[in-house]
């Protein structure tokens, strides 16, 4: 949880203090990542940090603001503190209630990171930020499709995750 807090503390936006307090007061540190991945206490933290590492690696030198990478990766599943289903809308709702200012690209990326869309027609999250969040999330959950097929292991070891991350970042 310390790393999550340190990343969020770097954000210089209205509502940051309120979101930090929400993170500390909520069950964020205790809940699992999802029904089929990171299924252990603290799994959501590990998943969020994996998504952050993947987005950071993929966006280096590509013009995505580093604060947007932090916002999308760390907050995309914030709504799971309320409910596992429909959490993306709840994530944005929590941020709105905290007075945290999201850019339009960040809001769209978080709201649509679970949409199943054709690779060439990412209509709901048309920015690179939305694409990077969706693919980073899929990489962390073991659902990312590579040219050799879909990764099916739902509990990727850190070593395998890092290998896949390097391969994806180079693509």
Task: Walk through the language-model features, giving the residues of each.
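Short capping loops/turns at secondary-structure boundaries
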Residues: 44, 67, 84, 88, ...
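Histidine/acidic-rich helix-loop-helix segments that form or flank divalent-metal centers
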Residues: 101-154
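Histidine- and acidic-residue-rich, metal-dependent catalytic cores
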Residues: 48, 52-55, 68, 87-121
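Histidine-centered, transition-metal-coordinating active-site segments
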Residues: 1-14, 54, 141-142, 152-171
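Divalent-cation-assisted or electrostatically stabilized phosphate/pyrophosphate-binding catalytic cores
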Residues: 84-97, 122, 156-170
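Acidic/His-rich, divalent-metal-binding segments that scaffold phosphate/diphosphate chemistry
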Residues: 1-83
